Amino acid sequence: MKMHLIEPDACAETTPTVLLIHPMLSSAEGMKTVLVNNMGDDLRYLVPDLAAHGEEDAKEYVSASQEAAQIHDWLLERNITHLSLGFGASLGGVVLSELLKFNDLSFDHLFFEGTSFWTGGFLASAMEFVLKKVFLAKHRKAIADPELSVQKMEQLYGKVAAKPMSEHFIAMSDQSIQNIIHDCSNVDLPTLSSDEQRRCIFTYGEKDFDLKRARKVLPKVYPEATLTIWQGYDHCERMTSDSAAYGQMLRELVV
């Protein structure tokens, strides 16, 4: 994990601190383009590159718990224990969930986009097996035909995000891909108090594969949390295709 710190010129103790954790195949740079540039220059942003992504693309992704522990250590080394907003998209949401297990950190708001509620078991294991086969096949095709990979990414996430996402996918090792899929199929959900649950917003595109599972599990584990559905969108699609409005929405949570 490599943390990128973006601070306003006039940064004070009262400046809201925002943690933005990217999804699989994105990066800190992707979060800057999609979110930071649309949230204003008067906030303090902490934007990590997870292992196997961005400037850390040469490193093997091992686990969400390892990434969260590294983020936690980075925060404590700089005496940052209270954040205005914690944001995690897809894989980033799994890492954010792991981060919530550290009781020495607190957040005013927690925002999860397209995060997994698959927590192991027979169905999750079957899904993990299939997804590993599918993603490894797609990985081989992307390496063989990078241009086609960019085109497919563009169809899902728009022109701006397509090329870097394709490049990250091609650079990623098979083992990192398998480890990420394992984590997203076996999420260890943290125990949250009623107050912590009320700080949580879980959002999904209406076409998101993970939505059905979230609708089933969320009311049982986090009954006080908010579920929002983006009509007409797929997995993590709104944050890239409607980034100006999305960034403004996140900003309004903290200012």
What are these regions (language model features)?
Residues 122-123, 140-194:
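Conserved alpha/beta-hydrolase catalytic His-Asp/Glu region
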Residues 209-215:
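Conserved alpha/beta-hydrolase "acid-adjacent" motif
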Residues 101, 107-138:
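Flexible "cap/lid" loop of the alpha/beta hydrolase fold
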Residues 7-57:
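Conserved HGGG/HGGXW glycine-rich cap/lid loop of the alpha/beta-hydrolase fold
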Residues 233-244:
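Catalytic histidine-centered segment of alpha/beta-hydrolase-like enzymes
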Residues 195-196, 202-204:
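Short beta-strand/loop motif that positions the catalytic acidic residue
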Residues 46-85:
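Active-site loop/oxyanion-hole signature of alpha/beta-hydrolase fold enzymes
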Residues 87-96:
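Gly/Ala-rich beta-loop-alpha elbow adjacent to hydrolase catalytic centers
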